[in-house]
Structures are given as structure tokens and as C-alpha cells.
């Protein structure tokens, strides 16, 4: 028995709920999959560099949707790319989260009015949990969005649904399934 064992043996009981343990584990090990489509992808890559050290937050980027629990959509989503975004989203295991990064991903950006080929926001095809504004947003803004995702995870639990947690964080959302169906119909027409 060493000196360390004596200190630990006095405090070896932790009282908490299963929700708190599960949420702590999930928010402390986010595995985002970056889906970089335009200028915002450069800022997303800069955020993953050593200057910002996302690993201190427990964030480890992954390249496969099957190993990710967070999808970062960064950049302009075109109508042709929309179906692939949905496919990647559906390949992610539950619970899964989506962060929309940049004006183009949030609302169509500068292509909103005249761009017939640009999706007017990724939330029309998949449910978005956190929006990061900017054109392109700075790495600090993306880190702020990631911290919002962690806050959302902390609020979720066995008794609280994601919908209730999202209502606490933000306003109402668009029903994504209806828009997915509309995009698929327009793509086949």
C-alpha cells in the first residue's frame, strides 16, 4: 500500500444517476465526421489542427459515418449532394447529432436567391441540432458550436428527450422527413 492508495480509499464512493454517467461519457468522447463542401471546410480543418487542440475536449475526428456520433456539415450543399448527405446521416449510429457550419449550410448563403442548384439549408433534409453562423465561421465559432452540442448532450437523459432538450436550447425545427421526401421527388422528376 502506497501513499496514493490511502488517499483514494477514503473517497471511493460516487453517488450519481445513470443519466449523468451516460451523458458524461458521451459528451467527453464526441467523434465528429466532417463533411466539408466549400470554404467552411478549410476553417474546420484549421480547427482540427494543433493550435486549437480539440482532443482536450474529448473530440476525435473520424472519417467514417459508422464510427461517428456528430456530423459537421460545412459548406454549400447542392441538390445533387443532398441525397448523399442523407445517406451518410442514416449510416451514423444513434444517438447522432448534426452541426451546420456556415451561412451556405445554414440557409443557402449567397446562393439563396439566384442559386437554383443549392439547398436552402441542410435542415431541410436532416435534423440539425446546432447552427454555427459565419462566412466562413472562425475556428473559435466552431468550438463554440461543439460546446453547444456537449451542452445538449448534458441536458439529455433517460427522462428527457432530445426534443425537450432542443426546445430549451432553441426554437422549433422543421420536420426533416417531409423535406427529404420532397427533395427525393424533385430529384426523380
Swiss-Prot record:
One GO BP annotation of this record: electron transport coupled proton transport
Cofactor(s) required, per the database record: [4Fe-4S] cluster
Catalytic activity, reaction form: a quinone + NADH + 5 H(+)(in) = a quinol + NAD(+) + 4 H(+)(out)
The keyword Lipoprotein is annotated on this UniProt entry: no
Any one Gene Ontology molecular-function term assigned to this protein's record: NADH:ubiquinone reductase (non-electrogenic) activity
The keyword NAD is annotated on this UniProt entry: yes
Gene Ontology CC annotations of this record: plasma membrane; respiratory chain complex I
Major location (coarse): membrane
Cofactor note: Binds 1 [4Fe-4S] cluster.
EC number: 7.1.1.-
Annotated [4Fe-4S] cluster binding sites: 39-40, 104, 135
InterPro entries membership: NADH_UbQ_OxRdtase-like_20kDa, NADH_UQ_OxRdtase_20Kd_su
SUPFAM superfamilies: HydA/Nqo6-like
UniProt keyword list: 4Fe-4S, Cell inner membrane, Cell membrane, Iron, Iron-sulfur, Membrane, Metal-binding, NAD, Quinone, Translocase, Transport
Topology versus the membrane: Peripheral membrane protein
Localization annotation: Cell inner membrane
Subunit-level organization: NDH-1 is composed of 14 different subunits. Subunits NuoB, C, D, E, F, and G constitute the peripheral sector of the complex.
Family: Belongs to the complex I 20 kDa subunit family.
Known function: NDH-1 shuttles electrons from NADH, via FMN and iron-sulfur (Fe-S) centers, to quinones in the respiratory chain. The immediate electron acceptor for the enzyme in this species is believed to be a menaquinone. Couples the redox reaction to proton translocation (for every two electrons transferred, four hydrogen ions are translocated across the cytoplasmic membrane), and thus conserves the redox energy in a proton gradient.
Name of the protein in question: NADH-quinone oxidoreductase subunit B
Amino acid at each position: 500500500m502506497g501513499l496514493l492508495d490511502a488517499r483514494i480509499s477514503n473517497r471511493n464512493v460516487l453517488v450519481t444517476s445513470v443519466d449523468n454517467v451516460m451523458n458524461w461519457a458521451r459528451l467527453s468522447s464526441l467523434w465528429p465526421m466532417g463533411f466539408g463542401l466549400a470554404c467552411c471546410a478549410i476553417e474546420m480543418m484549421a480547427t482540427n489542427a494543433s493550435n486549437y487542440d480539440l482532443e482536450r475536449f474529448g473530440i476525435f475526428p473520424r472519417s467514417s459515418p459508422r464510427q461517428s456520433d456528430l456530423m459537421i456539415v460545412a459548406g454549400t450543399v447542392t441538390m445533387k449532394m443532398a441525397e448523399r448527405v442523407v445517406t451518410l446521416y442514416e449510416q451514423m449510429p444513434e444517438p447522432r447529432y448534426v452541426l451546420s457550419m456556415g451561412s451556405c449550410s445554414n440557409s443557402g448563403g449567397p446562393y439563396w436567391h439566384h442559386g437554383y442548384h443549392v439547398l436552402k439549408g441542410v435542415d431541410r433534409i436532416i435534423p440539425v441540432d446546432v447552427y454555427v453562423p459565419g462566412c466562413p465561421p472562425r475556428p473559435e465559432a466552431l468550438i463554440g458550436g461543439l460546446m453547444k452540442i456537449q451542452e445538449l448532450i448534458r441536458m439529455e437523459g433517460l427522462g428527457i428527450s432530445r426534443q425537450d432538450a432542443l426546445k430549451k436550447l432553441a426554437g422549433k425545427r422543421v420536420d426533416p422527413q417531409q423535406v427529404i421526401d420532397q427533395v427525393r421527388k424533385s430529384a426523380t422528376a
